């Protein structure tokens, strides 16, 4: 995606220490130069999707901590499901960091309707109430418990990404300056 990916800690973790963990296996490999590179494969770890709904004590959750929720290979349906959980677990604060704020800016308009259409008619999501899902109400959207950020590695990346971040509906926006 950018120069900021050259020494990615997440790729290094996935290619070394986490390479035998089923949720990370095959997502990154070491190349001939000894650099960790993602393979381009994306994976939806559905077994953990409802975990925030089960946690009672409020937490700060880094969504897709070792990946990018707005990667081009991540289907909108996966993102819809993740946002539905965030809507249903408003006691937690969810932080999303992306190098692709242009996709977030294009994706987020209409999110409330998509989630409501998919889940709003349901009283429960699995065993959990979806009391946080409201249809296009100013009080609920953007979700007050979701922070959206972009990572930037230099001024050019900041100039390219920050305008998309600022144009994206979010309760809290942030910038992560990374080498």
Predicted feature descriptions by range:
Residues 1-145, 155-157:
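Conserved Radical SAM active-site core
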Residues 152-154, 158, 166-179:
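Histidine/lysine/aspartate-rich catalytic loop segments that bind and position anionic ligands
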């Amino acid at each position: 995606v950018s120069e900021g990916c050259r020494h990615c800690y997440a790729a290094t973790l996935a290619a070394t220490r986490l390479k035998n963990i089923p949720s990370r296996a095959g997502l990154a490999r070491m190349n001939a130069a000894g650099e960790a590179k993602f393979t381009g494969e994306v994976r939806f770890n559905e077994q953990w999707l409802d975990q925030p709904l089960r946690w009672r004590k409020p937490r700060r959750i880094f969504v897709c901590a070792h990946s990018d929720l707005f990667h081009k290979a991540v289907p909108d349906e996966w993102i819809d499901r993740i946002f539905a959980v965030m809507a249903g677990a408003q006691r937690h604060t969810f932080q999303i960091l992306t190098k692709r704020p242009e996709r977030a800016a294009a994706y987020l308009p209409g999110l409330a309707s998509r989630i409501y259409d998919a889940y709003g008619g349901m009283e429960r999501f699995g065993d959990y109430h979806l009391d946080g899902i409201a249809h296009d109400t100013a009080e609920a959207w953007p979700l007050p418990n979701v922070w959206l950020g972009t990572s930037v590695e230099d001024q050019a990346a900041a100039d390219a990404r920050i305008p998309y971040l600022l144009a994206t509906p979010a309760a809290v926006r942030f910038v992560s300056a990374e080498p």
